[in-house]
């Protein structure tokens, strides 16, 4: 899973600066910390929005410093994410 996290991090860091803050794994979930989602959705490219769709986000927690933690399943949904980037010639 570490290589999967590295790939996710590389994709998001490359495309979401300065919105991306961190990525980590907890058991069966991946945590992606980004700027407040209402701001990110207004400024990030449509293809990055699709990443979050593919991650099948199930919950968001707004933090005191105006960031949000997005948790997503790590299993089959990860394969869908990689397929999207490969098929998109990214």
Question: What is the predicted function of each stretch?
Answer:
Residues 18, 39, 56-57:
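Short beta-turn/strand-loop junction motif enriched in small, turn-promoting residues
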Residues 38-46, 63-90:
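Polar/charged, Gly/Pro-rich intrinsically disordered segments
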Residues 7-9:
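Helical scaffold of the NTase/Pol beta-like nucleotidyltransferase catalytic core
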Residues 33-37:
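Short hydrophobic/aromatic beta-strand micro-patches
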Residues 28, 32, 52-54, 71, ...:
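Solvent-exposed, non-transmembrane amphipathic alpha-helical segments
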Residues 1-3:
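N-terminal presequence-like segments and adjacent domain-start helices
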Residues 12, 43-63:
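Short, non-transmembrane amphipathic alpha-helical segments
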Residues 14-32:
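Short edge beta-strands and adjacent turn/loop segments
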